[in-house]
Swiss-Prot record:
A GO biological process held by the record: chromatin organization
Recorded family membership: Belongs to the Alfin family.
Record organism: Oryza sativa subsp. indica (Rice)
High-level lineage: Eukaryota, Viridiplantae, Streptophyta, Embryophyta, Tracheophyta
Protein name per its UniProtKB record: PHD finger protein ALFIN-LIKE 5
Transmembrane segments: none
Pfam families on file: Alfin, PHD
GO cellular component: nucleus
Function of the molecule: Histone-binding component that specifically recognizes H3 tails trimethylated on 'Lys-4' (H3K4me3), which mark transcription start sites of virtually all active genes.
Length: 258
């Protein structure tokens, strides 16, 4: 994505900045997980200040920081290589992950500022970013742990939108967003219905980051357990009936690369 200290800026959307964020994030996760041995070797403490960069095309690089001042975009943490041999490897990787998360947010909202995002566009961008686990959560395994902890709380409430955090029966992932259960006469039933309504309103599409079209067809990814507008992932109700286990575009691409 273009962005620098000079020159005109063309209009960009929150979705475009999010795609840039997601690509950089994927590259950095790759460096700290599947390519970790190569990453470890490149971070030689005998070398100068090194940085971990993630790029929009889902690649990564360990290199020296940009020489230009001020830099074209915010720079990642300097000198990640210096602490490598003085820490436990897992702790060091977790530290790099934390700094990587901070850098990704800085870059995303740098673009948001330069492209003149208003309050609503910034909100959409943040919500889309916040739907993804942080690099730290992926590297330390906290993301999987959170999913497992949330699943038991939702097993008896299959209609709650928060069930996107747990595996759902096939019928739930192939149907429009489930309606809230009917209100009971007792007070506890009313509270539960209110909670259902609030959580349904807060459920965001994993692709466009909005909760528009509550009456439209939605589908849930059986891998990452996020909800999507059918139109955003090009899945119709008729086609969904023939899909046993649905994978969203992100999860499908990860499997192909693996």
């Amino acid at each position: 994505m273009d962005g620098g200290s000079g020159g005109p800026y063309t209009s960009r959307t929150a979705e475009e900045v999010f795609r840039d964020f997601r690509g950089r994030r994927a590259g950095m996760i790759k460096a700290l997980t599947t390519d970790v041995e190569k990453f470890y070797q490149l971070c030689d403490p005998e070398k100068e200040n090194l940085c971990l960069y993630g790029y929009p095309n889902e690649t990564w690089e360990v290199t020296l920081p940009a020489e230009e001042v001020p830099p074209e975009i915010p720079e990642p943490a300097l000198g990640i290589n210096f602490a490598r041999d003085g820490m436990n490897e897992k702790d060091w990787l977790a530290l790099v992950a934390v700094h990587s998360d901070s850098w990704l947010l800085a870059v995303a909202f740098y673009f948001a500022a330069r492209f003149g995002f208003d309050k609503e566009a910034r909100r959409r961008l943040f919500n889309m970013i916040n739907n993804l686990p942080t690099i730290f959560e992926v590297v330390t395994g906290a993301a999987k742990k959170q999913t497992k902890e949330k699943a038991p709380n939702s097993t008896n409430k299959p209609n709650k939108p928060s069930s996107k955090m747990q595996p759902r029966p096939e019928s739930h992932s192939k149907a429009p967003k489930p309606p809230a259960p009917p209100k009971d006469d007792d007070e506890s039933g009313d509270e539960y219905a209110d909670e259902e309504e609030e959580e349904r309103d807060n459920t965001l599409c994993g692709s466009c980051g909005t909760n528009d079209g509550k009456d439209e067809f939605w589908i849930c990814c059986d891998s990452c357990e996020r909800w999507y507008h059918g139109k955003c992932v090009k899945i119709t109700p008729a086609r969904a009936e023939h899909i046993k286990h649905y994978k969203c575009p992100d999860c499908g691409n990860k499997r192909a690369r693996a």
